[in-house]
């Protein structure tokens, strides 16, 4: 599974005229299930995402996770947006291949599992809508962006 995470001041996702998720300071995570991914891979990726230290401590060092963005136990928001294009194979030609991505039904199942697990472990979780044409708006903080990937 893959997550492209961005530290944000705020972010939201819309489907048409409807806002499906919105956060203040925290992490926007674009999430993709690959062929062969399992719940174990989703759990491993979620643990990494929730524990990844990308927020600055009092000394200005990236040393705090999304669960403690202010150093006093204050949790930041987590906006999870499905994005199968992260699994694209771009090694040949001028058109990406999406063969490495999980099939849509499996991708939806794993994304839903990931979201449910995140909601059990983090107090502020918002989402996009799997398979929808979404408009994502964000204000990067830094910018700070990381590619997280775990293998099944």
From Swiss-Prot:
Q: Which domain of life is it from?
A: Bacteria
UniProt-listed SUPFAM superfamilies? DTD-like
Does the record bear Disulfide bond in its keywords? no
Annotated Gene Ontology cellular components are: cytoplasm
Please name one Pfam family that this protein belongs to: Tyr_Deacylase
Q: Name one GO molecular function term.
A: Gly-tRNA(Ala) deacylase activity
Q: Which CDD domains match?
A: Dtyr_deacylase
Where does the signal peptide begin and end?
Answer: none
Q: Where in the cell is it found?
A: Cytoplasm
Instruction: Establish whether keyword Hydrolase is in the entry.
Output: yes
Protein keywords: Cytoplasm, Hydrolase, RNA-binding, tRNA-binding
User: For this protein, what reaction is catalysed?
Assistant: glycyl-tRNA(Ala) + H2O = tRNA(Ala) + glycine + H(+); a D-aminoacyl-tRNA + H2O = a tRNA + a D-alpha-amino acid + H(+)
Q: What enzyme class is recorded for this protein? A: hydrolase
Subunit structure, interactors included: Homodimer.
Known HAMAP family for this protein?
Deacylase_Dtd
Read off the domain note.
A Gly-cisPro motif from one monomer fits into the active site of the other monomer to allow specific chiral rejection of L-amino acids.
Protein's UniProt name: D-aminoacyl-tRNA deacylase
Q: From which source organism is this entry?
A: Burkholderia ambifaria (strain MC40-6)
Recall the taxonomic lineage recorded for the source organism.
Answer: Bacteria, Pseudomonadati, Pseudomonadota, Betaproteobacteria, Burkholderiales
């Amino acid at each position: 599974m893959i997550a492209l995470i961005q530290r944000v001041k705020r972010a939201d996702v819309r489907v048409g005229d409807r806002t499906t998720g919105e956060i203040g300071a925290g992490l926007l995570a674009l999430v993709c299930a690959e062929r062969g991914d399992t719940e174990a891979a989703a759990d491993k990726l979620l643990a990494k995402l929730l524990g990844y230290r990308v927020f600055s401590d009092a000394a200005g060092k990236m040393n705090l996770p999304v669960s403690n963005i202010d150093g006093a136990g204050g949790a930041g928001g987590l906006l999870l947006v499905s994005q199968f294009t992260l699994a694209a194979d771009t090694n040949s030609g001028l058109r990406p291949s999406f063969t490495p991505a999980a099939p849509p039904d499996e991708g939806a199942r794993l994304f839903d599992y990931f979201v449910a697990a995140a909601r059990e472990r983090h107090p502020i979780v918002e989402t996009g809508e799997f398979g929808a044409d979404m408009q994502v708006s964000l204000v990067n903080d830094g910018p700070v962006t990381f590619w997280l990937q775990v293998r099944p």
